[in-house]
Amino acid sequence: MLNRENKTAITRKGMVSNRLNKFSIRKYTVGTASILVGTTLIFGLGNQEAKAAESTNKELNEATTSASDNQSSDKVDMQQLNQEDNTKNDNQKEMVSSQGNETTSNGNKLIEKESVQSTTGNKVEVSTAKSDEQASPKSTNEDLNTKQTISNQEALQPDLQENKSVVNVQPTNEENKKVDAKTESTTLNVKSDAIKSNDETLVDNNSNSNNENNADIILPKSTAPKRLNTRMRIAAVQPSSTEAKNVNDLITSNTTLTVVDADKNNKIVPAQDYLSLKSQITVDDKVKSGDYFTIKYSDTVQVYGLNPEDIKNIGDIKDPNNGETIATAKHDTANNLITYTFTDYVDRFNSVQMGINYSIYMDADTIPVSKNDVEFNVTIGNTTTKTTANIQYPDYVVNEKNSIGSAFTETVSHVGNKENPGYYKQTIYVNPSENSLTNAKLKVQAYHSSYPNNIGQINKDVTDIKIYQVPKGYTLNKGYDVNTKELTDVTNQYLQKITYGDNNSAVIDFGNADSAYVVMVNTKFQYTNSESPTLVQMATLSSTGNKSVSTGNALGFTNNQSGGAGQEVYKIGNYVWEDTNKNGVQELGEKGVGNVTVTVFDNNTNTKVGEAVTKEDGSYLIPNLPNGDYRVEFSNLPKGYEVTPSKQGNNEELDSNGLSSVITVNGKDNLSADLGIYKPKYNLGDYVWEDTNKNGIQDQDEKGISGVTVTLKDENGNVLKTVTTDADGKYKFTDLDNGNYKVEFTTPEGYTPTTVTSGSDIEKDSNGLTTTGVINGADNMTLDSGFYKTPKYNLGNYVWEDTNKDGKQDSTEKGISGVTVTLKNENGEVLQTTKTDKDGKYQFTGLENGTYKVEFETPSGYTPTQVGSGTDEGIDSNGTSTTGVIKDKDNDTIDSGFYKPTYNLGDYVWEDTNKNGVQDKDEKGISGVTVTLKDENDKVLKTVTTDENGKYQFTDLNNGTYKVEFETPSGYTPTSVTSGNDTEKDSNGLTTTGVIKDADNMTLDSGFYKTPKYSLGDYVWYDSNKDGKQDSTEKGIKDVKVTLLNEKGEVIGTTKTDENGKYCFDNLDSGKYKVIFEKPAGLTQTVTNTTEDDKDADGGEVDVTITDHDDFTLDNGYFEEDTSDSDSDSDSDSDSDSDSDSDSDSDSDSDSDSDSDSDSDSDSDSDSDSDSDSDSDSDSDSDSDSDSDSDSDSDSDSDSDSDSDSDSDSDSDSDSDSDSDSDSDSDSDSDSDSDSDSDSDSDSDSDSDSDSDSDSDSDSDSDSDSDSDSDSDSDSDSDSDSDSDSDSDAGKHTPVKPMSTTKDHHNKAKALPETGSENNGSNNATLFGGLFAALGSLLLFGRRKKQNK
């Protein structure tokens, strides 16, 4: 029988306070998800432990029976929860497990060194103290069998009322009813010399029972359920009279270590299965207080959870009868070692025996993947016990490409603490298969309909979510022990992609994912003061194109047990339950009944020895009863209940004892006094299923239909109740009296009723839509109804843009979205209306066989294409209205095509490399050319540029006439227009007209060829003979600056001649340019335009026109003035030349004219000197030649006047007038040859310094040349002026530059007129001649000088 007062398991042979010590986690099945048991959980309850499945051992079966802590166990799938290691009791209702066979021994009672004087209560025999110890003065011991009075309260601290806490036994105090992890444990009566099962763990918290300090429980990182211990202090070990020592050699143990396959699937999984450690330990009497023994376990074993507040603790071993601590525990986590230190209990008692019954766990930290022959071992004292197991982790949950796995990995709970209810963590593996997922989303939800008392919660205020990306190829720990240092924290990337819902859920949007992710959910518990809360959390992964996949985790409770010897007093108790099926036997699903009074009498004396009231769960417990016969009576039954039959079946622990029964206490608790009661009400209902084969009979593979409405009516047709079928298709009307009822089933949408009453099994056939049910002293669960899905079909297909208007769907043609499509029946009634999606698809669903009419609305701006083109009805157009027939299958052939009634205009701009005006195959397009479209009124409609292939296109054009203008690309010239007969290949020029008439016009082309580029330049040379012609021996002048200007006078280029005197300007278009040569320092411009263009000098500035060819005729020459004359005068003359230099004066030529005079010729004076050498004859005549110099001066007429004698000479010298031509003056040089006097004249040359002045004033010299030499001397003084003139006055002496040429397109130089004289030197020479002639006249004839005009 089950005692629901303390959730303890009571047998006729004894009692175990399993409510105190044992809670278990079960593998829950939630919906279609496989909820793997994560890690263990304990909600702040005393010394409770959590494990995956509760252990059962046949050898301990008779000793104790434990009951689960889960008060709401009837709301969970107990088939999944209660999977024991050996047997499963069908009558277990709340995670009940049988443990151990305990044999009763009447001998070897404990011998106490000091007897304890009781104050009140019944007397109980106890053992005497060890023989070598003196008795206490208060002892009444007479011998080993001396009786001693011990009060019930001393023997067992709590009474019945004190056991209101699940775990803790406290004094009667309402404020102590809540769970407190630091209160004392319930004591048990176990013989010290005959403990076989030791099914209870008694934890000494060394604290006053009134201290409230709820335990914080934390789960390990591993998914394996691990032992959890409540918060407590290690019991202080009193110093012994002798030095403490290791007494492993004085400890003997009988130990079993068994791998428990909780779900019996022959697969050992750390997350679900566990190890059962049971040991009976005998302590040698030589052991003293302070001595210790050890329990060592392998690194593959996890003894308890990693609660940071409990890490150092493990349960002490106590005497369950009096609560005394036998040994205190200390855990060395680094070395997997538990050290138990004995208290003075071993000094006062002999033959101490202890029992350990632990569920310990496989450490997934050291077993990261599936592995065979994993060894587990535990060494108690000096005895090692081993076992092995093949570890096989479950695969991830996979559906198509979606995959997921999860586990609880940590939890801390504070039951009853509103401010800090605790927290828990769940680790989720997302896409561990590393598939490529589209629109992947993870939903985490702390809810499941089967677990309404779930205390998990998820919301943005209390939940923290971390997301880690797993490297490709990385192997995740199957035990969910995650090393985040090896992963990439991507939490920040997803903060804005986490959405919290109102139903304790969060959705993480991963988008497109092709790697695995680890999601760690850290959140707080909801506040609870429940003694049996549950935690369930689901995780669901969805992605586009794949079925979603779910997993989840649920937590329950268990506890490990240890115990030692105690006083022999016992308990009576068990359970009052509602026997819903009235069979007198406790069964799963039947609930306890509270507030029933239970009274116990000594059957021999009829004395009342105890009384209790059943708790809400129906349990009760009456403690402190010695061996004897007792009468148990139940009273105060709830109104309307009747007593179920008693003594049904062969199991006295599960049957009903009736209202009064006599039971016996004999050496152990008797937990068999139960009472079953029931309400005389009945149920009616059964099942609604999908009859897939339509045979009217429920077959094994046919499933229920959920959500079907079922109505219950009385015989008169009045509606009594309405229910809907559950997820399995079940329905039930409860609390019904005997009578006739009418049941009506509503046909679920999309289904058709199956055939009725097929076959002879009324529990398997279908009763149809309406049936009658009779209740007559029993439930009627035979009313079923079957349905099969009404066949439905789809009709639809595609609306597309038929760009080529051929009425057929081509692969490049796209759908048209938003087109309205209407479905009508044969009578023209509208059934459905839809619109095409973004791809042009549409579909009408849920249609039955029949003929339908489909109408397409022509989209705006489109025209229907031709209908029925081709033979493939799947790709042709059915027009805007068509008929579709459905006959036992979908019809996906109804299409409609449309096109836009607009056209395109354009074609091509190409580089016409051969300039023939026709597109040739090897000629390519020109990109980036601007093309403008105008209407007939010259209004710009559109502008485009040609693409990389030279193509252009104007789209969406109506019929009409258009003007197209092409902009000439930079560096190109339009080619010839309309060459050839092919309008698609020729060039339409820069402007053309295009006509659109119901078709595209793609014939408007324009060709261009690259505009030719030309070069300009030639040569600057040293004209050593000053003839203005390039001779083969004359060399180029380097570094002469040459500047190029465009027609606007803007500088477009500057260069310098190279070492050969060459220069060049490249990349020039046809056009007008100006070339300016910068005169080199110290050089004089040579004469220009003396010969053909490519050999002559063109002067300092040249205008040139380039037309379709290069021009390499632009040359210029310079020479260096000769300064070899002894006469400084010639220098002064050369000064005048230097003046002319600035304008590249041809004066130098005129100077060369006066070869007769060595004076003014700066360059050819040396010639005049040589001339003077050649002439020895009539100087006077030759002087007249010097007059002829005046001829070189255009003033020569006046000179000839001054020379009456030599007029004829001067006339002949008039040839020297040609000196003004600057070339013919060389003839006058020969004149000077006749002037051999010029030696003496050369003196006069020094006088003729005045000539240098006369340079500045070519006619002042004509004034009385013979005025006097002194005058001319003064002139020579003024010569110094001419010296200054040489550089600064050149402009004054030559107002127009001596040589400025303009070239026509043949580059022929034209002379420009001068306002001054080009032959200053020649004038000077003439002046000298005139002066000498005048002087001669004065001396010989006394004549005045002639005035030159």
Curated annotation (Swiss-Prot):
Compositionally biased tracts (Polar residues): 62-71, 94-108, 146-155, 163-173, 860-869, 972-981
Motif (YSIRK-G/S signaling motif): 23-34
This protein's GO CC annotations: extracellular region
KO phenotype (gene knockout): About 3.5-fold reduction of survival rate in human blood and about 2-fold reduction in mouse blood.
Listed Basic and acidic residues bias regions: 130-145, 174-183
Function: Cell surface-associated calcium-binding protein which plays an important role in adhesion and pathogenesis. Mediates interactions with components of the extracellular matrix such as host DSG1 to promote bacterial adhesion to host cells. Contributes to the resistance to killing by innate immune components such as neutrophils present in blood and thus attenuates bacterial clearance.
Motif (LPXTG sorting signal): 1312-1316
Subunit structure, interactors included: Interacts with host DSG1; this interaction increases S.aureus adherence to keratinocytes.
Family listed: Belongs to the serine-aspartate repeat-containing protein (SDr) family.
Record-linked Pfam families: Big_8, Gram_pos_anchor, SdrD_B, SdrG_C_C, YSIRK_signal
Keywords: Calcium, Cell wall, Peptidoglycan-anchor, Repeat, Secreted, Signal
Compartment(s) where it occurs, according to its Swiss-Prot or TrEMBL record: Secreted, Cell wall
Source organism of the structure: Staphylococcus aureus (strain NCTC 8325 / PS 47)
Induction: Less protein is secreted in a secG mutant (at protein level).
Comp. bias (Acidic residues): 1091-1101, 1118-1288
Boundaries of every CNA-B domain copy: 569-680, 681-791, 792-901, 902-1012, 1013-1123
Region spans: Ligand binding A region: 36-568
Protein name: Serine-aspartate repeat-containing protein D
Entries under InterPro entries matching the protein: Adhesin_Fg-bd_dom_2, Adhesion_dom_sf, Fibrogen-bd_dom1, Ig-like_fold, LPXTG_anchor, Sdr_B, SDR_Ig, YSIRK_signal_dom
PANTHER family: COLOSSIN-B-RELATED (PTHR36108:SF13)
Topological category with respect to the lipid bilayer: Peptidoglycan-anchor
Annotated spans, Disordered: 54-185, 856-883, 972-992, 1081-1325
Modified residues (Pentaglycyl murein peptidoglycan amidated threonine): T1315
